[in-house]
Amino acid sequence: MVGEFLKREREALGLTQRDIAERTNLMRQLVDELEREDFHRVAAVIYGRGFIKLYGEALGLAPEKIALLQQDFSTIYNGLSQSPIKIKKEEKPL
C-alpha cells in the first residue's frame, strides 16, 4: 500500500522520518501517520494527495509514480480499497 511503499523507499535512501519532515515541512508525526496509513488528521482527500506529492518529491520519485500513489491514497481515503462490487439487476418475473 501507499504507506508501506513510502516507508520502504525512505529507508532504502537511508532517510529518517525527521529528514522527510524537514524536506517537506510536514510534522514528523504526520509523516509517521502517512506511513502507517492512519489518515485521521487528513481533513480532505485533496490535502492527503498534496502530502503524498510532497513526500514523493522528497524521495525523488518520478511524477508518474507520485500520481499512482495519489490515486491509491484517494482509494484508501474514500474507503474504496476493494474493487467495487457489481450488483446485478433483479430480473422481473414474466
What are these regions (language model features)?
Residues 39, 47, 60-64:
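Residues in soluble alpha-helical coiled-coils and helical-bundle/repeat scaffolds
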Residues 28-45:
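Recognition helix of helix-turn-helix/homeodomain-like DNA-binding domains
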Residues 51, 55-56:
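Hydrophobic micro-packing sites on short alpha-helices
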Residues 10-11, 44-48:
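Short acidic alpha-helix initiation/capping motifs at coil-to-helix transition points
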Residues 1-8, 12, 16-19, 29, ...:
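Low-complexity alpha-helical segments at protein termini and membrane interfaces
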